[in-house]
Amino acid sequence: MVLLVVDTQQMITNNKLYNFEVFEERVKCLIEVARKNNIEVIYVRHDDGLDCELTKGKECFEIYEGFAPLDGEKIFDKTVNSAFRDTGLLEYLKDKGEDTVIVVGLQTDYCMDATIKCGFEHGFNMIVPEYTNSTFDNDFMSGEKTYKYHNQYMWNNRYAKCVSFHETVGMLNS
C-alpha cells in the first residue's frame, strides 16, 4: 500500500478549491499517518510545458508547503493527466509489488480522474478517501457538484473504493 499525492502544487492548492479547509486538513493528516506507519508517500507534479505558468523551475510548480515531501520521498513529474503514463510510477509500483494505491490530490475532474481510471486499468486497488480531492468551479458545474459526481457516482465501485476518511486512517494504521 502507498499514499499517492497528486498535483498538490502551489499554483492550484488554494482556498478557491471546493471545501479547501477540509481537503487541506485531511491530506495533511493522511500524510502524517502514512509516515508514522512507514507507508510510502509518493508525490506527482504536473508540468504544462515551457511556455506555461505551471512548469518545472517556477516556484508555483513546487508542492504546496503544507504537504511538502521529506528528503528521500519519491516525486514523479508528468506532462499528461494520468500519473501512470510515461512517468516511471507504474514500473516503480510494479517492481515493489504494490497492489493498493490510496490516492489524494488535485484536481478531481482532471488528473485525479485520469489517475484513478488508469490505476484501475493497470490492476491496482484504488482507494479514494472522502474529501481528499478537490477542484474549482467551472462554467458547467460547481466544484462541489464535480466532487460529488466523481466520488459518489463515477468512481465508487467502478474504478475505486471511495471510503470514509476514518476508514482510510484505519487502513494506514493496520
Where does each model-flagged region fall?
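A short alpha/beta connector and helix-capping loop motif
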Residues: 16-43, 47
